[in-house]
Amino acid sequence: MTTNRKFAIAILAAGKGTRLKSKHPKVLHEIAGKPLLDHVVAAAAKVVPPSQIFAIIGHEADRVREAMQASGIQFVEQKEQRGTGHAILQTRDALKDFDDVLVLSGDVPLIRTDTVERLFAFHREHAAAMTILTTEPPDPFGYGRVFRKHAGQSDEVDRIVEQKQLTPEQARNREINSGIYAFRVQPLFANLDKLTTDNPHGEYYLTDMAAILGGASEKVVAIRADDSHEVLGVNTRQDLASLDAHLRLQKCQQLMSAGVSIFKPETCMIDSDVEVGPDTIIEPFVQLLGNTKIGADCHIKSYTVISNSTIGDGVLLRHGCIVDSSKVAARALLGPYCHLRPASDIGEEAHIGNFVETKKTRVGKGSKANHLTYLGDTEIGTGVNIGAGTITCNYDGVNKFGTIIGDNVFVGSDTTLVAPIELGKGSYIGAGSCITENVPDDALAIGRGRQVVKEGWATKKRAEQKKKK
């Protein structure tokens, strides 16, 4: 944001979240794959650099600091949780060189960057000491109502009346205080010590600054948010589920607007940071999680779960695939019901089929493992066929060992490859073999007992059994 005034953002993130009934800090509970606080920081960081964002932390402060360290934001600790006004008081030294501060809530995760920008622009335009972000939700019960001057026809705020103090006439006003504000730093801290704890909870409420600043002849104004969902906070598990569903559906709508087909989007779980290319089809009950990136022209069938993985263009994922922290190149075919564990790297046009599990395995272009196979710590070349029931034995109880399979190798069904081992290019492995030694290029390896046929044996056996009866 371009402005001549130096502008900071403070995020209230010290609360315990008692109604969540959790041992975890409130702001670290997740929706759409990220902590609540992470969503707020993401919106704020598009307005000011992280060095100008101050998270006020308290309950489980060390855990919150550790979880958000990579964001580059600053932290201010509120050692005693004595209310929102007391929280802002802790930032006095941190904000001494700033002209304005915008106060966000770490448990209000749907706030949008453009709303933050609108709020500050409105605040600056009106030269206000305090600007309140308001909204008109379908059901305003429980929220403090904002009353404007001149019978509601003014930007200036007359007063805020809490739910318990509302008269029946006042209760008809649906404009609520969102708890998100912009302040001029100088009048804020000049008057902050006027806050009292004269309320049922014995806390210092930042909301009371509207009356205090107004009484000091400072200008207090309000601006409405476009969407009431933006300012909804999380207090209960029900709130968490509701906002998660809203954010995920919003994500689906964004993807569909960008050319992605999503059938029954309300059944899909797509995290905030997921990217999907155009003309990809996503069937019901698909989960795309974490930092997943899906290419164009893919088809992802129902009950597939992809997390922190990269999928190339034109990949078909049949029903029930699980892909975790892996890469899949263009035009590969997966499933149904395959499991790619971390560090799997599936090449172009490769096939990983029914009940095949891979881990730390690279599969070359056009290679196929279509049925009932485990491939762990394995390097597979191009044009390889892995028969049904093949197992790489990569673990001796202490250490893991690798298997190398060269280009154009044919591995027969029900084969056991005991690592460390290497199969040379173009070699053949007979079905049912247990291979314990390296196989040269273009060789045939058979590691099984020789078949013995005894003609007439079954007839004699049945005759003997009959005599014993």
Swiss-Prot record:
Region (N-acetyltransferase): 259-469
Predominant location: cytoplasm
UniProt family annotation: In the N-terminal section; belongs to the N-acetylglucosamine-1-phosphate uridyltransferase family.
Residues binding acetyl-CoA: A388, N394, Y395, S413, A431, R448
Enzyme class, UniProt record, top EC level: transferase
Residue ranges, annotated region (Pyrophosphorylase): 1-237
Region (Linker): 238-258
Organism lineage string: Bacteria, Pseudomonadati, Acidobacteriota, Terriglobia, Terriglobales
Entries under InterPro entries matching the protein: Bifunctional_GlmU, GlmU-like, GlmU_C_LbH, Hexapep, Hexapep_transf_CS, MobA-like_NTP_Trfase, Nucleotide-diphossugar_trans, Trimer_LpxA-like_sf
GO biological process, one term: lipid A biosynthetic process
Name listed for the protein in its UniProt record: Bifunctional protein GlmU
Annotated GO MF terms: glucosamine-1-phosphate N-acetyltransferase activity; magnesium ion binding; UDP-N-acetylglucosamine diphosphorylase activity
Record note on quaternary structure: Homotrimer.
Species of the source: Koribacter versatilis (strain Ellin345)
Active site as annotated: H371
Catalytic activity reported: alpha-D-glucosamine 1-phosphate + acetyl-CoA = N-acetyl-alpha-D-glucosamine 1-phosphate + CoA + H(+); N-acetyl-alpha-D-glucosamine 1-phosphate + UTP + H(+) = UDP-N-acetyl-alpha-D-glucosamine + diphosphate
Names of required cofactors: Mg(2+)
Cofactor note (record): Binds 1 Mg(2+) ion per subunit.
Positions that bind UDP-N-acetyl-alpha-D-glucosamine: 12-15, 26, 78, 83-84, 105-107, 144, 162, 177, 235, 341, 359, 374, 385
EC number: 2.7.7.23, 2.3.1.157
Binding-site residues for Mg(2+), renumbered to this chain: D107, N235
Pathway assignment: Nucleotide-sugar biosynthesis; UDP-N-acetyl-alpha-D-glucosamine biosynthesis; N-acetyl-alpha-D-glucosamine 1-phosphate from alpha-D-glucosamine 6-phosphate (route II): step 2/2; Nucleotide-sugar biosynthesis; UDP-N-acetyl-alpha-D-glucosamine biosynthesis; UDP-N-acetyl-alpha-D-glucosamine from N-acetyl-alpha-D-glucosamine 1-phosphate: step 1/1; Bacterial outer membrane biogenesis; LPS lipid A biosynthesis
